[in-house]
UniProtKB/Swiss-Prot annotation:
One cellular component (GO) term of this entry: cytoplasm
Residues that coordinate or bind ATP: 119-125
Modified residues (N6-carboxylysine): 228
Pfam families in UniProt: Mur_ligase, Mur_ligase_C, Mur_ligase_M
Role: Catalyzes the addition of meso-diaminopimelic acid to the nucleotide precursor UDP-N-acetylmuramoyl-L-alanyl-D-glutamate (UMAG) in the biosynthesis of bacterial cell-wall peptidoglycan.
Domain of life (superkingdom): Bacteria
Binding site for UDP-N-acetyl-alpha-D-muramoyl-L-alanyl-D-glutamate: 32, 34, 160-162, 188, 194, 196
Protein name: UDP-N-acetylmuramoyl-L-alanyl-D-glutamate--2,6-diaminopimelate ligase
Amino acids binding meso-2,6-diaminopimelate: 390, 414-417, 465, 469
C-alpha cells in the first residue's frame, strides 16, 4: 500500500506544529498494537477500553516506531512533545475520538463505495449477498466482517466483526488498490459506539433486525438499539434500507423520512419500499414475488428460511437504491450461493441431514429452527451451547427456544472461555420445562455424533452457534474445532 503524509498535514485539524523538522516527518503507516509495529511505523497510543496504549510507547519505539502519537492527559497536555530514545512523542487531546478521521486523512481518497450493514442477525449474509450480486453484475466487490475481510474467494481472517478505526481505513484503501469498487461492511454496535466507522461515507446503510445480544456491553436494549441507529443518525449514510417487520425498524423509519422500507408482510409506509406479495419455501430455495418502488418481480435464489427471504429483499433493495437494474438483479439471483456456515446443509442418502448455522442468540436460534421445521419430515434436533464470559441472561432463553422449537435438544459447549462448562450448561438447563428430556454432551463432536446415531433418515440436526468458526475457546487455550468439518466427517463427505 503506497501511502504517506507529512505529520503536519495529518494532524492539522487538531494541532499546528511549529518545529519545521518535526513537521516534515513522514507517516506511512499507523498502528495501534505495539506488538505489530515494524520499522518506520507510527505508533498511536490511546486510552483503550481495556488497555492504556501509552504504557507500550517504549516497547513500540524499541520495535522500530519512528514517531508516536499519544492521547493527551493531565500530565501531557495537547501539543506537548517529548523525545524518548530520540523518537518524538506528540500528545493530542481526545486522540481516541479522532482515529477514524486521522486514518482517513492518511488512507482515504479512494473510490471504494461503502455499504454498511447493521443488526443483531443477518449482517454476514446480507453483506455477502450484496457482494456476490455485484460480482455477478460485473463489479469487483469485497466484504469486511465476521468471516473475514477481502474478496469472497480469498477472505483474510478478522479478529472482530468491525476492526479498529485504523485497520478499517487501511483495509479499505488496500481493497481499493486491488480493484474493489464496492465494499460491504458489517457495522457492529461496538464499532459504532466506539467511533470505528465515524468518518466513513456510506452510499447505503442496511438495518436487518434487533434482538437480545451484547447486553454485557451495552447494559440495556435501549442503549443497544441507539448504537445501531447511530449508523443512520450520526454517520454519513446516503440511503437507509430498513426492515420494517422488526419492531425497532418500524419505529426508526418514522425518524428517517427518506428511508426505504422492506417487508415480507405488508407495504411499508415509507418514501420508497419493497414488499413481498407471496413467498414459497422449498429445499431448492426461495421464490419471492414482490412489489416495489422499482416495479414488481419474481426472485428465485437457492437459500432456505424466512429470514433469508428478508435478507434477500434487503440486499435487493440496497442494490436497487444504488441504481442497478431490476431485470439484471433478478436474472442473476439464481446464481447466488448460501454463505459459509449460515444455514449450510450437509446431506447423504439414508442419513439425517445436518445443518450448520451461526445462530447464537435466542432470536436467531428460533428463526433457524422455524426455517428448518418447514423442510423436516421427521424429528428436528437442536445442538446448542452458550459462550462463557458473556451475557448470562440469554442462556436459559437459548435452551427454552431449543426446547420449544425442536423435538430433541442436546446442550453442549460453545467457547466456554474462563467459565466452567458445567456452570454454563446449568444456567441453560434452568430455562428448560422438561430438563430430563435434554441430553448433555459437552464435547461438540460427540454431541453431533450422538445425534446422528439416534436420528432417523428424515430427521434434521441443527448444529447452532459456531457457523464458520473453526475453533473452540477453552480456559487456557484455543483448540481447532469446526461444526462444518464435524458434519462432513460424520456423514463421510469430501471436504
Amino acid at each position: 500500500m503506497n501511502t504517506h503524509s507529512a505529520i503536519s498535514e495529518l494532524i492539522a485539524p487538531w494541532l499546528e506544529l511549529t518545529d519545521p523538522k518535526l513537521a516534515a516527518l513522514v507517516i506511512t503507516h499507523l498502528e495501534l498494537d505495539s506488538r505489530l509495529i515494524k520499522s518506520g511505523d507510527t505508533f498511536v497510543a490511546i486510552q483503550g477500553h481495556a488497555v492504556d496504549g501509552r504504557q507500550f510507547i517504549d516497547k513500540a519505539i524499541a520495535q522500530g516506531a519512528n514517531l508516536v502519537l499519544a492521547e493527551a492527559d493531565a500530565q501531557h497536555l495537547n501539543g506537548w512533545v517529548e523525545y524518548r530514545a530520540g523518537v518524538p512523542v506528540i500528545y493530542l487531546a481526545e486522540l481516541g475520538q479522532h482515529l477514524s478521521e486521522l486514518a482517513g486523512r492518511l488512507y482515504g481518497g479512494h473510490h471504494n463505495q461503502l455499504i454498511g450493514v447493521t443488526g443483531t442477525n443477518g449482517k454476514t449474509t446480507i453483506t455477502q449477498l450484496i457482494a456476490q450480486w455485484l460480482e455477478l453484475l460485473g463489479h469487483k466487490a469485497a466484504v469486511m466482517g465476521t468471516t473475514g475481510n477481502g474478496f469472497l474467494n480469498a477472505l483474510e481472517p478478522a479478529a472482530n466483526t468491525t476492526g479498529n478505526a485504523l485497520q478499517i481505513q487501511a483495509t479499505l484503501r488496500d481493497l481499493a488498490e486491488r480493484g474493489a469498487q464496492y465494499t460491504a461492511l458489517e457495522t457492529s454496535s461496538h464499532g459504532l459506539v466506539q467511533g470505528r466507522v465515524k468518518k466513513l461515507h456510506f452510499v447505503a446503510g442496511v438495518f436487518s433486525n434487533l434482538s437480545r445480544d451484547h447486553l454485557d456491553y451495552h447494559g440495556t436494549m435501549e442503549a443497544y438499539a441507539a448504537a445501531k441507529f447511530s449508523l443512520f443518525s450520526e454517520h454519513a449514510c446516503q440511503n437507509a434500507i430498513i426492515n420494517v417487520d422488526d419492531a425497532v425498524g418500524a419505529q426508526w423509519v418514522k425518524q428517517l423520512p427518506q428511508a426505504i422500507g422492506v417487508s415480507l408482510v405488508t407495504k411499508p409506509n415509507t418514501a420508497q419500499a419493497i414488499w413481498a406479495r407471496e413467498v414459497a419455501y422449498a429445499e431448492s430455495g426461495i421464490t419471492l414475488n414482490f412489489e416495489s418502488s422499482w416495479g414488481e418481480g419474481e426472485l428465485h435464489a437457492p437459500l432456505i428460511g424466512e429470514f433469508n427471504a428478508c435478507n434477500l429483499l434487503l440486499a435487493l433493495a440496497t442494490l436497487l437504491s444504488l441504481g442497478f437494474e431490476k431485470s439484471a438483479l433478478l436474472a442473476t439471483a439464481p446464481k447466488l450461493r448460501p454463505v459459509l456456515g449460515r444455514m449450510e446443509l450437509f446431506q447423504r442418502e439414508q442419513k439425517a441431514k445436518m445443518v450448520v448455522d451461526y445462530a447464537h442468540t435466542p432470536d436467531a436460534l428460533e428463526k433457524a429452527l422455524r426455517a428448518l421445521r418447514v423442510h423436516c419430515a421427521g424429528q428436528l434436533w437442536a445442538i446448542v451451547g452458550c459462550g462463557g464470559d458473556r451475557d448470562r441472561g440469554k442462556r436459559p432463553m437459548m435452551a427454552a427456544i431449543a426446547e420449544q422449537f425442536a423435538d430433541r435438544v442436546i446442550l453442549t459447549d460453545d467457547n466456554p472461555r474462563s467459565e466452567s462448562p458445567q456452570a454454563i450448561v446449568a444456567d441453560m438447563v434452568a430455562g428448560l420445562t422438561y430438563p430430563e428430556r435434554a441430553h448433555i454432551e459437552h464435547h461438540r463432536f460427540q454431541a453431533a455424533s450422538y445425534a446422528l446415531q439416534h436420528a432417523g433418515a428424515q430427521d434434521i440436526i441443527l448444529l447452532a452457534g459456531k457457523g464458520h468458526e473453526d475453533y473452540q475457546v477453552l480456559a487456557n487455550e484455543t483448540i481447532h474445532y469446526s461444526d462444518r468439518e464435524t458434519a462432513q466427517q460424520l456423514l463421510e463427505l469430501q471436504p
